[in-house]
Amino acid sequence: MPSRERVEAFLKEVVEGSHVTAIADFYHDDATMQENLGVPRRGKEMLMAREQSVLDQLQKMHTHPVQTFLVDGDNVAIRWTFDKTDKDGVVQRLEEVALQQWRGDRIAKEQFFYDTATAWGVVGPDGTVQR
């Protein structure tokens, strides 16, 4: 079971932009990640490689400070907001909820939930998402 401080350390690392390092530091070797009801990706090395591959396609990934997260025993829920800037400078936003199952002080399973119809909406100059 993770302590609240351990979860906060994970959140801090992601918000600071250290996405791949966060996987290295906070996930079990046999961890899984799953997008909605898609096929889970398995294994820390694969998760790190996939994350790096996604980041390499972007100019920038900005993680908004987390306003809401819950810790209940081995279960953690996080409301994430991400802005990605592509190579052409277009900014898009994703809001999602991540449900994690921790084993000890590391993440064993993570599943992301978001609306695929509105995911990655373009962020206008005024900061609002255009759908």
Language-model segment annotations:
Residues Q111-R131:
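Low-complexity, intrinsically disordered terminal/linker segments enriched in charged
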Residues E51, H64-L70, D83, E95-Q101, ...:
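Hydrophobic/aromatic beta-strand elements that line small-molecule binding cavities or substrate pockets
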Residues M1-D25, D29, G127-R131:
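Short, low-complexity N-terminal intrinsically disordered segments enriched in polar/charged residues
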